[in-house]
Amino acid sequence: MVLKKKKKEIQVDAFSLDCQQLEKLQGFSKAEEQNLASLLLHCAQLSNGIQQIQCIKQIMPLVKAMDQNSACDPMLKACLEILGETYFSLNMKNPLKKVLASSLNGLPEWFMTLAVQSFVCCLREELKTTDVYLYRKVLDNLASCMEDFNLGRASITNLFEEVLQFLQKALLDIQEENRSNNGNRIVQTRLMHDLLMAIKVAMMLVQKLQENIQGSLWKNHESFVWQSMCNLLKSSSDFLMDETLLQTVQTTSGLAFILFTKAMYEPAEELPSLVSDLLCGSRKLASMPAWFVNNCGALCTEQLSDSVLLFLCHGALAMLDWKSGSMGENGEKLLLDIASVLLSLSSELKESSMATSLSRILAIWTNSALAALIPDSPNLKVKLNGNSEVVGKLLEYVYTHWEHPLDAVRHQSKLIFRNLLQIHRTIIAASDEKSDPFFARLTRRLLSLEWHVKGKYASLACLVECLGTENILQLDRSIPVQILNVMNDQSLAPYASDLLETMFTNHKVQFTSGSQKSTWIDQWHDVWVSPLLQILCEGNHDQTTYIIDYYLPKLLRCSPDSLSYMIRILQASADANLGSWSTRGALGALMACLRTARAHGHLELSNIMSRGLVSTESIKQGLVHQHNQVCIDALGLLCETHRSTEIVSVEEMQLILFFITYNLNSQSPSVRQQICSLLRKLFCRIRESSQVLYKWEQNKTKQELFEDSPKRNPLGILQKYQDFLSSLCDRLFEALFPGSSHPTRFSALSILGSVAEIFSVQKGQEQVFRLDQEINSARVRTLIQCFASTFEEVKVLAFELLMKLRDVVFXLQDSESLDLLFQAAMDLSTSTKPYDCVTASYLLNFLAYHEDLQHICLGKWIKHNPQMNEDTSVGTVEKNILAVIKLLLVNVEEEIFQAKKSLLQAAASFPMYGRVHCINGALQQLPLNNLMFVTEWKQIVARLILMSYELSAVVSPVVQSSSPEGLIPMDIDSETADRLHMILKEIQPQDTNDYFMQAKMLKEHCKIQSEKLAEHKPMENICTEMRGKESQICDVTAQMVLVCCWRSMKEVSLLLGTLCKLLPTQASSEPSHGLITVEQVKNIGDYFKHHLMQSRHRGAFELAYAGFVQLTETLSRCNSESLRKMPEQWLRCVLEEIKSCDPSSTLCATRRSAGIPFYIQALLASEPKKGKMDLLKMTIKELMSLASPSSEPPSAIPQVHALNILRALFRDTRLGENIMPYVADGIQAAILGFTSPIWAVRNSSTLLFSALITRIFGVKRGKDENSKKNRMTGAEFFSRFPSLYPFLLKQLEVVANTLNSEDEELKIHPSLFLLLLILGKLYPSPMDGTYSALSMAPFXPFIIRCGHSPVYRSREMSGRALVPFVMINEVPHTVLSLLKGLPDSASLCIRQNNIHGTLLQVSHLLQSYLDSKQLGNSDFEQGLSDIVTCIGSKLWLAKRPNPCLVTRAAFLDVLVMLSTHLGNSQKQGMQFVEFWEEMNRVISECELMTGIPYLTAVPGLVQYLQSITKLVISVLSVTSAADIQSSSSPTAMKIAKPPLSIVHLLHSEFHEVRLLALEAVLLWLKKVNAKQIAKEGGVLCLLVDLEGVLLSMTLKEKNLECFYKVLEILYNMDLRNVLPKIECSIKMNPNEFLTWSLDIMDNSNSTEVRSMALKFASKLVVHLLENHQQISEEVLKKWVQQLIYFCGDEQETEMLLAAAEVFRSITSLLLISEKLVLGLSDTLAMWKCVILLLQNEDLVVRDAAAEVLQVAQAEKKSSXGAGFMFRVMNAPLALDLAFGTLCEQLQQWGQTCAGIPVLLEWLLGDSDPRGGLEPSAPEEDECLFDKGEVNFWAEKLTSARLLGKHLLLLAQATHLALPDGGELDRLCRRAQDQAQLTARLLTALPPSPEFLKTAEFTKLAIQNEQISLCLKILNLLQSVGKGKDGNLKE
């Protein structure tokens, strides 16, 4: 829905006048009539700025009414003076200033002189300002005066010299002040912006008042104006050269420099030459004027930095006049020089802001070039046409930057490309674009790019704008479908949709402007709409979602009329194609189209209904669809609309309530979010439309003409709104029942929260609904009970809702219940279960808002502070929180005191972290900016800090232990205290920094440490068993100790971080105002430093890191310089400590440097990102020098620390693009570090390298390791990291030289792996041009030599790495050269490693060639033919003469690739008859034919067998093709009969061969079953008579994978073909075969095998029953039992899915048959399984089980005929229908007598209420993280209520055969006994059981409701029975 945003109310600050001005106005104002003075006086007395604006607008009419003689009126003079003073006093951004200027622009001519005098007077006063920090106001005023304000401009003209003088002074003063504040970032930033404004004002002065500075007069070099201009020029050149200034200041200085030079330089036509000389560094000082050299000496003489050159280029492009070649040949030369300079800078400037500037300036250059092109500039046309060098280099820039990580660079690349096309188009204006070779070549190259290249989309769009869509489509008609197929990737979807929009819009324009004006729409639909509809129906979830979000709205906007075509097509197939859980189907596509159309205003729902576009039933079907997104689209159709005040119809409200019933329990967070968001839109619409309805009601008498409009009865609609919202809230509160799932609670609370927020009472508005009126004490209790949820987001939502309703909530709570809640919170805050303290925190935060908290609850715990009670006006929350924190603090201080004596007792009885967590939570509720009890808070803060240190000291020995978490050794004998001694000994730190140098002598080391411990840590009162609060014995476990200590540390860290946030209040003038002192902050910093630098565990330093980040962020925002400098001091200290390599260093030296990288990360993250990032630069420089190997032999520790810290920094997303300039250096350090002899350095280098690969190529976005999504072109890579080109080339050469083929010695260079890994991430691009200085060719020979490595993996990687360095058209030549390098069979020296490496390289190159888009190209075919011929000459390598099986396998893999490709293009394949003959020869001579001669395992044997098998299968597939089999040509007959059959493969003794053969058979079988026989006709002949072979394999096959495949093939076969053969193949009859299938499930341990066996056995059962063949009762019973077993909640998903599939297949036959086929008990047991599957936690299982009900509904519809049936549904609806269908079946079978008691048993539950409620054994209590039920989706009460609903309906049915009275009495007695027991158990629970015994309370509450429901049905049945008995008696 498009909700129009309410315009923000403009805040206008009112102006006021001083006493003197007011007196002056009062003297002139007249009471009897309004004059100018009285108007101004009235205006000044207004306090509202908006009203003042209205008042000022009345000034001009009043002034214009005055005659010319009034110019001498002192009143007018006084008023103009006041107006001038007011104008200059107003802030620049105040709208009043603009309104005043606008009004004064209308001043009559005769008053101008007087007004100018007044303004000049005011401006002169302004220019006298001497305070640097007040300059900004003057500068703003000068800028305002020149901005469309006649008076202001006239005033500046009058004071031109004074203004110039002020500007010179301002520039110098601000620069000086900036230098004196070096290091004070806040002040410097402000001064920089002031300096920027001063430069801008100077430029405005020169641009807007040119007449004052041009002409002969001022160019006298002695004149003041000339001197002033010289000074301004000097300042601008100084600022331009000053690298310490902000980049924006330097950029603007570049503009100013060119502008000032242009104004001063003569002759003007020589100016371009001067700029060219500066840019090219020719420094022709003699030809430059002396004044220029004197003022800009540095620019003329020094070597200009890259940034200065860039800003000079920008200045020249922006400030010189390029239009129509006005600067002549010099201008053309300058234009080309600028391009040359910019392109040379592109390889140097890699820092993100500079790269962005460069791309923007290049785009400006292309605009200037376009402007400079005129018909009579042939030289420029030659230099700028598409084939020129300049354009070529610019295109290369575009190709290497169109996937740049910065959005701005990508956007500018697109603009550059578009402008380059326009330049070429302008140059070739006379000729046709279609035939132009430049455009043709560019189009071909772009289309041959892969679709994952984002730059392709924008560039193609530009090309479409130039050439037209039709010209592009003529090259490839499938482009629209290709682009739509790309849209399943969200990162590409926006680009794809933009390209599609450009194409279809352009196509439409082409059609409508052409000759086919009447018929174009059908063609347009075929191209753009039909593929869309097909994908919407059948596409995957992501693809359809992104198409609907990005593409569909654009398509409808372009052609709204296409909607009716889309609806017509989809409606026609909606009934037949309803979709499934994986596809939307036509129904889902229809919902999506209608939703989008309605949301964008193309349709209204009333029209949709009335025109029959979709029925209510169809929407209902959509609302409960299996596909989540169809449900959301159906809901969106109801909720979203273009008009925010459109009235919600009754149908919409009914459908929403229907939706809520079945969709609250969605496991998908995104679906829940969308539901809440859409309903929020609906509520907003109800609110907005209700306001309209209230207005209609007020104006009802005027609306009598509207007979049929809703205006007739507004109150009726409002009442319906109220009823709807009330019903909705009832359902939502009902959904918060005991045991409701987390998704249900989340959805219900979110929607209730939206209702409370949207329908909150606002002043002056009647509200249609108020949630607080729906609240009662039971609902309040329900909301408070949500705090007991183990999911924190539920607690958050409940808390927020209670806060919105707190007025009514607290009124409904009595003091006793509040007291119990407080007591529960205090108990939970010290619970040993970690999630209990979170509940306690929410309870305390909730109670803190209660006014009487202190009287009701806190009075028992702490003494009242009389001062606080006296002042009742003080905020309730602050008083309560202060009291709560005091209470918690007192408790925790006492507990810490006890913990010092015995940490173990604390862990078992009162873990302290819960109290601290509650303190933290309470602090979050505080209004920190507005505290009343500052003195008390100061004391509390000081105590909290001390408490934190003490608690940390108690627990840190455990946290900083060297033992991994949880691996504290445990003694089995819990009766002795030795274990506790062991715990405390083990948790002492035992690591030293000898980690790098020597292995630890662990036993001795531990022994010494233990002795020290024994000496220094005598323990008192240690025992294993301790009595807790409830006097029960509590056994201390290691987990308890660990949880207590780790969580305490975490809470302390967060608390200290929170307390640091109190620091900014310290910046006030009075130090006493702050709650925390500077000294305390420094101590906190030292505390964090200690833990970050010395902790060994990631967990420990991560906990400290969270708090430390808060501290550093706070310090960075401080006004106090000493505090602000602290992070920098800490950073320098730690870097020095790392460098020092002192053996006594306390730095933690672990494998990854533990917390040190975190420490440095936190310090750098606090540095402002928009500055120069000096700290980051300094740190990286230091670390790089440490990380790089040096010739001196220092300790390895600093190098390891440096590498680890660099890794952390490169992984830190907060540093963003600021870290990218250092990536190349990082790669070099990592690769060089990998050559270190020290393992620790190599390890850290590897980790750093991995982080850098991710930083460069992005996070892996798929399972495919070599996916092109995580790669980039070689050109782009070396363009972004140019320094890596020479480095990688040199390293590769060194590596290749170590692999000297002449040397027999085995040499492996350590860098080989990393080099090949990074080179393998690159890929070739058709766009790689000839203008790049970095050629890829030099890499190729070295990579080829790397293929000779003795390491298998390296050879494999070299094959992959070679691909990007060989252009596609070069592949055949390279492959031929590699193949020719292979030895002949007669060669003397055969090196198998070299052969293998070469074959792998051939394989990868060939694969890239066959995958390329060159297919069908004549060059491609010739290249392929040459390769096939050459391969034929080396075939000996695939045969027996080659003794190495590994290289034989590699050669065979190449043959398989060729065979598959040639087979797929059979027309081409038939040209290579010799190839196929050779393949047959290779197969006939292979070991599969002649037998395997190897007795023992031989290296590569399996690999060889797999490769030869793949070749056989490939050849079989090709030769089985129908055209070959039926052909009579001798060629075809030669190759039609391969030497090996599939049966031969299936009989192989090697399971690897059998497995591949079975996979091929399965694939062929599925193709046959999928009716692809037309294409795969020949496959049928391969499957003939396989049944017997497969059946015999079932008994013989020992390999599990093969056995599974055999079963799967049999399952997919037609049993009519299989069963006749079982007798002769395996000597079994069908019954025995079924028994054998069932036995597999008992005997196999494989889930896959058992699942397939169940499916196969079930298929057999169905087949036998349908064909009326006898199955023994025992076998059937066994089958049913297996089915039931498969449905257990604990079973694996695959088994559950198998069971669901079986139930679907037997639904018609057994579950809903007219007569019972199996016994009632078995049938009911199977129905119970279906119901269990519908409640499974796994969505896939639920969806599969829902298909059972879909089959049942479809069957019902076909038998019952008319009437609406749900034919595709989600699990909640299916569950409802399952119970309904079962009850109907019981009636149909006449089994209600026997069936109802069984269903009542289900309802009652067969478990004892006491189950799980008995006092647990101590060891059971040890589980600290028990979260209750395992299934987080199933809701027992939901299924109970649904079953109860259907049983009640069944009980009320007429002619019902009731169960026996005795049976009902037995059930009744049992239910009553259980009810009494449940009541007793509930009363036995402690107070507030919902919090203190949540699981037990929930279980009993559920059972209570189940029993009540059961008793209700029993009573009804008994009353019905008695009624029937009475009737019988009568």
Curated annotation (Swiss-Prot):
InterPro entries: ARM-type_fold, THADA-like_TPR, THADA-like_TPR_C, THADA/TRM732_DUF2428, tRNA_methyltransferase_THADA. Disulfide bonds: none annotated. Keywords: tRNA processing. GO terms for biological process: tRNA methylation; tRNA nucleoside ribose methylation. The keyword Disulfide bond does not apply. The keyword tRNA processing applies. Pfam families: DUF2428, TPR_Trm732, TPR_Trm732_C. Belongs to the THADA family. Together with methyltransferase FTSJ1, methylates the 2'-O-ribose of nucleotides at position 32 of the anticodon loop of substrate tRNAs. This is tRNA (32-2'-O)-methyltransferase regulator THADA. It comes from Gallus gallus. The gene is THADA.
